[in-house]
Every structure is written in structure tokens, then in C-alpha cells.
Amino acid sequence: MAKRTAPLLLLTLAVGLAGGSQGDREPVYRDCVLRCEERNCSGDALKHFRSRQPIYMSLAGWTCRDDCKYECMWFTVGLYLQEGHRVPQFHGKWPFSRFLFIQEPASAVASLLNGLASLVMLCRYRASVPASSPMYHTCMAFAWVSLNAWFWSTVFHTRDTDLTEKMDYFCASAVILHSVYLCCVRTVGLQHPSVASAFGALLLLLLTGHISYLSLVHFDYGYNMMANVAIGLVNLAWWLVWCLRNRQRLPHTRRCMVVVVLLQGLSLLELLDFPPLFWVLDAHAIWHISTIPVHTLFFRFLEDDSLYLLKESGAMFKLD
């Protein structure tokens, strides 16, 4: 349902990331980066670096300065481990072992698999549900919004830049808001389309304001997390209440309830903040991996519910 719905306790983690991390504040790290740039990132040394840099690295946007940061990160980590200290974070992230040009291999692959799961279920929904179903177009729009979010999540975990970070965060917010809209259409909009239209316009206005503030005023990690958590909790509560009220009449709502509970439970994985296993697999990657089957469950619910609504609307048409 919502791509990044997390408990309120995560707010403290998000705020902590905004001010930098222990690793990148270390004088040894900063001095290492400075010396590396002076030695390798200007004049003939820079030309030599570019000539020996693999083409896939340059196409992915890896610069000499980026390579200096990467090498100095591992140099600093090595010193920490030698002295028996805990592995530090750098720029709000744990140190990850780069694979080819992929910055966070496990999270990137998991995001890609989530996207593929969404694509498979989108195709299945499209093949099994006629376009005449009352929820067809709303569900298809939600599927495309989700697919777009997982695309940018894959790009962001492959290469972390200001642009890819913003696109990942903004598209995640769009999924959460669209899930709320989907719930509104299903629970209210089928009987009162004007209410759903007005509510959709309000959500679009909220998303526009959210993106404008983060882009033009201040990219506040704490505020972004707070906004997503607040909307995510509204989303989960709305779906859960509706499912509980209709579970006897609509047995397929049980899948939706399972998704709601799973999302809330799996989000707790984000609290297990630990250095990546084998420098690849951290809690965030495990969370991404664990959400893959959730797409299947939720789209199965959407498919069953859309077919039920189609059957119900057909029966009403015959009665008329």
C-alpha cells in the first residue's frame, strides 16, 4: 500500500540524520578527502583519473571527488575497527561496499524487485479486470504511481545524488497520498464522486506544497518523515477501519487487513539500525526485501474487490 509507512519512533532517527554523521565529521576523514582531491582531482592527475575510470562509472556520474570520499570512508572505517570502535555512519548512511557503479547493491536490487512485483501485478490486474469496473482507472493510476516510486527508489540506491534523493522521497510521498485517495474513492467516492474529486484535489495541493517547501525553502528530513508518517497512519487507519466493518460481507478484505498489519509490523525493521552485514545488507535493505510479497497481496485484494464491484454494478443494472 504505502511505500514508506513507518512508526512515529522513526522521527528521532530522521532528525538525527539531518545534521551529518560521526564519520564525515572526523578530522581524519576530512583531511583524507582534502589530500586525495589535491593529489588526484586537478590538472594532469584528473586527466589520468578520467582516462582509467571505467565508462560505466563515468556514465553513472561518479566523479574524482566521489571516489575520494569513498576511499577515505573505508580508510576511516578501518581505523575505527582497529581501535575497537563501532562502525560510524557517513553523511547519514552506513558504509556500503560498492558493486560496479551501484552504491547500495542490496537496497537497489530489492527496490528493483519491488518494482517488478508491482509491474507483474499491474499486468495481471489489467488482464483480469475489465475497464468497466468502477475502481479500474483509480487502481491502474495507483499501480503506475507505485511503479514510478520503485523506479526512483532503485535509481536513488544505485546512485545517491541530490536529484535522485529528492525524486525518491517525493515519489514515496505521492504513493502514500495516492493510497489515501484510493481508499477515499473505494469507501466514499463510489457513492459520492464529487467528494472524492474534491478530496483528490486537496491531496494534490498538499503534495504540491510539500514538494515546493522541500525544494524551494528547506529540505528538512525531520519534517518530511513527520509528514509521511502522519499521512501513512491516516491511510492505515482508514483502510483498517473499513476492512473491519466489511469483513463479513466482503471476505476478500482480509487480504487488505493483512497488508495493513504487515506494513506496520515490517516498518519496525527500520528501527534495527545496524552496520550492513558483509557491508551490503542493512535494516533498510531487509525492509525493502520484506515488502516484495506485500504488493502481491494488495493487488490481489484490488483485483478481487474490482471484480466484486463489477459484478455488483452489473446486478444493479439488471435490476434497473
UniProtKB/Swiss-Prot annotation:
Any Gene Ontology biological process: GPI anchor metabolic process
Glycosylation sites: 40
Places the protein is found: Golgi apparatus membrane
Membrane-side (Cytoplasmic) residue stretches: 120-135, 191-198, 245-257, 300-320
UniProt enzyme class: hydrolase
Parts of the chain on the Lumenal side: 24-98, 157-169, 220-223, 279
Record-linked InterPro entries: Per1-like
GO CC, any one term: Golgi membrane
EC number: 3.1.1.-
Keywords: Glycoprotein, Golgi apparatus, GPI-anchor biosynthesis, Hydrolase, Membrane, Signal, Transmembrane, Transmembrane helix
Membrane topology reported for the UniProt record: Multi-pass membrane protein
Main function: Involved in the fatty acid remodeling steps of GPI-anchor maturation where the unsaturated acyl chain at sn-2 of inositol phosphate is replaced by a saturated stearoyl chain. May catalyze the first step of the fatty acid remodeling, by removing the unsaturated acyl chain at sn-2 of inositol phosphate, generating a lyso-GPI intermediate. The fatty acid remodeling steps is critical for the integration of GPI-APs into lipid rafts.
The family this protein is said to belong to: Belongs to the PGAP3 family.
Protein name: GPI-specific phospholipase A2-like PGAP3
Organism for this UniProt entry: Mus musculus
